[in-house]
Each structure stands twice: as structure tokens, then as C-alpha cells.
């Protein structure tokens, strides 16, 4: 469950602008704020089942966006390469403060 929650949070970060206002709200409450389905249903005055169905459809939409656009996959690949590069430079004592700062800036561009 923890892995799924992390994945949904990352997908939400990348693709939230493609979601409706309602989808954003439900997913935000559920995954980011850790509300239960019942708490969200009470907040929006709808059934627990309506919240569940909407969140499931939104999860499917987020996965479809990722399948087509691949933003999370590319981000994870870049992070892995930056980590490898940093380790290689550190190992060879090439990692001075200026290079370290540049690597950090590259990581933070997205």
C-alpha cells in the first residue's frame, strides 16, 4: 500500500493539472492528507461509494497519462543518472562545491 501511495502522489504531482477540480480534491484528500473515504464523503456530502469510484477512475486516468507521457518514468531515470554521476564524481574526487551546486541545480529544474 505504501508503494502505491507514493506512486499515486508522484503521478498526482506530474499530472494534476489534467484532472478536474473534483478529482484533484478527492485525490488530494485521500492520498496527500490521508483522509478516509468516509471523511471525504462527509466533507463533500456524497456517498462513500461515489468517492471510492471517483478515486479509482482518477487512479486509472493518472496511470493512462503516465503510460502515454512517461513523465514519472523519465524523472526517475534522470534521478538515477544524477545519483550515479554524483557517486562517480565523488569516488574520483572530482566533486567540488561548484560541481555539486551545478548537479543540485540540474536536479531541481523539473
Swiss-Prot record:
InterPro entries to which the protein is assigned, alphabetical: RNA_pol_sigma_r3/r4-like (IPR013324), UPF0122 (IPR007394), UPF0122_fam_protein (IPR054831), WH-like_DNA-bd_sf (IPR036388)
Transmembrane segments: none
SUPFAM superfamilies per record: Sigma3 and sigma4 domains of RNA polymerase sigma factors
Domain of life: Bacteria
Any Pfam family matching the protein: UPF0122
Function: Might take part in the signal recognition particle (SRP) pathway. This is inferred from the conservation of its genetic proximity to ftsY/ffh. May be a regulatory protein.
Similarity section: Belongs to the UPF0122 family.
Protein name as catalogued: UPF0122 protein lmo1802
Amino acid at each position: 500500500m505504501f508503494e502505491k501511495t507514493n506512486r499515486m502522489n508522484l503521478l498526482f504531482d506530474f499530472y494534476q493539472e489534467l484532472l478536474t477540480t473534483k478529482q484533484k480534491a478527492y485525490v488530494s484528500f485521500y492520498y496527500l492528507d490521508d483522509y478516509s473515504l468516509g471523511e471525504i464523503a462527509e466533507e463533500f456530502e456524497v456517498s462513500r461509494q461515489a468517492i471510492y469510484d471517483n478515486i479509482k477512475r482518477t487512479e486509472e486516468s493518472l496511470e493512462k497519462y503516465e503510460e502515454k507521457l512517461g513523465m514519472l518514468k523519465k524523472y526517475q531515470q534522470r534521478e538515477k543518472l544524477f545519483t550515479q554521476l554524483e557517486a562517480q564524481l565523488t569516488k574520483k574526487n572530482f566533486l567540488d562545491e561548484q560541481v555539486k551546486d551545478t548537479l543540485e541545480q540540474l536536479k531541481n529544474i523539473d
